[in-house]
């Protein structure tokens, strides 16, 4: 543990359901003036950053849907899928035009309802799709939600560590409201990366890496990954993080596992005034 602290490798503790509990990390680094500028930048341009972030998030949902539709011809004529694509496209337009964070939150909630309303259709050849009706958490009530919650937590941990590494304050965000104990900027950053986690979850399910035997149902009704399920998921997650993807801003291939750090570094450059705008990650642009 001491060596990890010296090398600034975070050690995270999670509950069996994947909820973050605590972390061991080295001394906080970074220029205090960068954090002051972070506050100023987010106060001045927070709404525009949030609008771009949500537009990217909805675009990534559309990309995930289109990838599945491309591979499964029967979905091309599915009325619910067509309607969902239209709704998310309209969500992008509304996000770009809205004039307040409160309005943006409403648009995000509506788009999330649309997306997860058809999410089970993206799960092909695995009967766990039948257990998913809508997004639920704390606790997750079905296997698909259990995996989603676990993966989102992994992404959140990576984003928080990445932001701290580049010297930004992960607790001062531009979209998620400041709340004691919540890493609001990590919550912001993870929004553009959720699509990666969701595609990973779909791969696990569609290739039947995860099945019914990898979950336990609690007396409370919560459905959680068991030891075998967590082991399978974490093994595949590490494999995923080592594979490379094209980054449209850097114009080179980078491992998936470094994307939180790449985006955090770009955000830090924006805060320092080295970039005119911060560009969220669009999955459709990671394909040459």
Task: Enumerate the predicted regions with their spans.
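Trp/Phe/Arg-rich N-terminal binding region typifying the photolyase-homology
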Residues: 1-45
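Active-site helix-to-loop segments that bind/position phosphate- or nucleotide-bearing substrates
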Residues: 32-288
């Amino acid at each position: 543990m001491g060596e990890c602290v010296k090398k600034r490798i975070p050690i995270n503790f999670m509950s069996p359901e994947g909820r973050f509990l605590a972390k061991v990390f080295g001394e906080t680094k970074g220029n205090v003036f960068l954090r002051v500028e972070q506050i100023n930048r987010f106060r001045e341009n927070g709404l525009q950053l949030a609008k771009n972030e949500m537009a990217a998030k909805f675009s990534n949902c559309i990309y995930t849907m289109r990838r599945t539709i491309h591979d499964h011809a029967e979905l091309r004529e599915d009325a619910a899928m067509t309607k969902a694509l239209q709704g998310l496209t309209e969500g992008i337009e509304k996000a770009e035009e809205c004039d307040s964070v409160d309005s943006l939150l409403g648009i995000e909630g509506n788009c999330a309802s649309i997306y997860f309303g058809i999410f089970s259709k993206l799960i092909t050849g695995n009967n766990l799709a039948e257990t998913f009706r809508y997004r639920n958490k704390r606790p997750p009530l079905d296997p698909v939600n259990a995996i989603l919650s676990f993966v989102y937590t992994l992404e959140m941990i990576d984003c928080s560590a990445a932001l701290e590494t580049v010297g930004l304050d992960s607790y001062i965000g531009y979209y998620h409201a400041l709340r004691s104990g919540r890493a609001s900027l990590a919550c912001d950053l993870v929004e553009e990366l959720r699509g990666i986690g969701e595609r990973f979850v779909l791969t696990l399910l569609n290739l039947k890496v995860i099945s019914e035997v990898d979950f336990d149902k609690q007396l409370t009704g919560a459905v959680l990954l068991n030891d075998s399920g967590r082991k399978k998921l974490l093994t595949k997650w590490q494999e995923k993080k080592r594979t490379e993807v094209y980054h449209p801003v850097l114009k080179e291939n980078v491992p998936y596992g470094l994307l939180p750090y790449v985006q955090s570094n770009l955000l830090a450059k924006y805060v320092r005034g080295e970039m005119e705008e911060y560009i969220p990650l669009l999955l459709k642009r990671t394909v040459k």
